């Protein structure tokens, strides 16, 4: 959601952001499993933000279950995360799907400072950086996230998809907050 699809379009590329904020490799694998055959990408630009490799993925699982269809990949994700919040949301999500309660729902294109742009980009109103202290932390990679990331890379390579790994810029204060 952080790559402006309009810029790629101006350069002659057809793109789609297949992600959300705080999305971990576990959710990326679900989306890739669900949509790869329809999208058939020739290239994948994958943002490898360290903190998404550190978290458990529960928050993003709730978002994915609530905002996309639910299927065997949703169940697999819930079992991998093994968290009561994910299980409860999955049950609720399947109930909404079975009762067709999501068919008429339409996500608003504008929500607060966020504005959806065709292709999966979310533009945010201009805000000025205000420096502040950021708590120091070690980067501690969650083994499950890293294992899933490796599976994604292996799958994309097996499909002859060009992969570009990027790390979006962060403020120098944020960068210095990592203690290892």
Report the location of each language-model feature:
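Membrane-embedded segments
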Residues: 1-78
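Generic detector of short, locally flexible boundary/turn motifs and exposed helical patches
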Residues: 8-13, 127-132, 167
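Second-shell loop/turn segments in exported
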Residues: 17-22, 136-142, 175-178
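Small-side-chain structural scaffolding
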Residues: 19-21, 28, 84, 89, ...
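Generic hydrophobic/packing signal
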Residues: 22-27, 49, 111-116, 156, ...
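Secreted/periplasmic serine-hydrolase-like ester/acetyl group-modifying domain
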Residues: 61-164
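Extended hydrophobic/aromatic segments used for targeting, binding, or gating
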Residues: 157-180
């Amino acid at each position: 959601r952080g790559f402006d699809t309009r810029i790629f379009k101006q350069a002659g590329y057809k793109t789609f952001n297949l992600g959300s904020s705080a999305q971990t490799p576990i959710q990326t694998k679900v989306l890739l499993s669900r949509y790869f055959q329809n999208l058939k990408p020739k290239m994948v630009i994958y943002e490898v933000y360290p903190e998404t490799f550190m978290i458990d993925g529960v928050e993003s699982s709730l978002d994915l279950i609530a905002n996309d269809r639910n299927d065997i990949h949703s169940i697999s994700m819930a079992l991998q995360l093994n968290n009561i919040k994910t299980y409860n949301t999955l049950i609720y999500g399947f109930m909404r799907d079975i009762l067709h309660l999501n068919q008429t729902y339409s996500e608003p294109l504008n929500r607060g400072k966020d504005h959806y742009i065709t292709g999966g980009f979310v533009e945010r109103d201009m805000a000025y950086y205000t420096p502040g202290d950021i708590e120091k932390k070690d980067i501690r990679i969650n083994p499950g996230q890293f294992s899933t990331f490796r599976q994604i890379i292996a799958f994309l390579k097996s499909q002859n998809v060009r992969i570009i790994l990027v790390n979006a810029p962060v403020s120098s204060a944020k960068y210095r907050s990592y203690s290892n």
